[in-house]
Amino acid sequence: MALGGRSFRSKKQQLAYDRSFAGRYQKLLSKNPFIFFGLPFCGMMVLGSYWLAGISQVKFDRDDQKVQEMNEEEILKMKHGKREFDIKEEYYRLQGLAEEDWEPKRVERFKGESDNVF
């Protein structure tokens, strides 16, 4: 493109554009890019950071409400109702549970499929 991607404007159109907000901003932006682009961008990043910090703090406060410190009475109640733990007893108890839940059963085969019985 000969105009570098810009559209051609007549003199009247260019004067009207220069008087518009976009034209004045573009002129100021070309003179001082940091003041008119960089500074607002950095400001938005800082303000966004503070805004998002407030939103995420609500999440952390809600999670902290779920976790509460226990008093002595609650600790004693937990210790009193607890049964003794023996690793061997738990092992044998879990071994017995596994035997009750299943029974051997052959999977039905499709017609013409071998039974793989040797």
Swiss-Prot record:
A biological process from GO: mitochondrial cytochrome c oxidase assembly
The cellular location(s) given in this protein's UniProt record come to:
Mitochondrion inner membrane
Q: Which Pfam families match?
A: COX16 (PF14138)
* GO CC annotations on file: mitochondrial inner membrane
Main location per the UniProt record: mitochondrion
Keyword list (alphabetical) reads: Membrane, Mitochondrion, Mitochondrion inner membrane, Transit peptide, Transmembrane, Transmembrane helix
Q: How does it sit in the membrane?
A: Single-pass membrane protein
Return the transit peptide range from the UniProt record. Answer: 1-28
* InterPro entries the record matches: Cyt_c_Oxase_assmbl_COX16 (IPR020164)
Q: Where are the transmembrane segments?
A: 35-55
Q: What does this protein do?
A: Required for the assembly of the mitochondrial respiratory chain complex IV (CIV), also known as cytochrome c oxidase. May participate in merging the COX1 and COX2 assembly lines.
Please give the family membership noted in the entry. Answer: Belongs to the COX16 family.
Name used for this protein in its record: Cytochrome c oxidase assembly protein COX16, mitochondrial
Q: Which organism is it from?
A: Candida glabrata (strain ATCC 2001 / BCRC 20586 / JCM 3761 / NBRC 0622 / NRRL Y-65 / CBS 138) (Yeast)
What does the record give as the organism's lineage? Eukaryota, Fungi, Dikarya, Ascomycota, Saccharomycotina
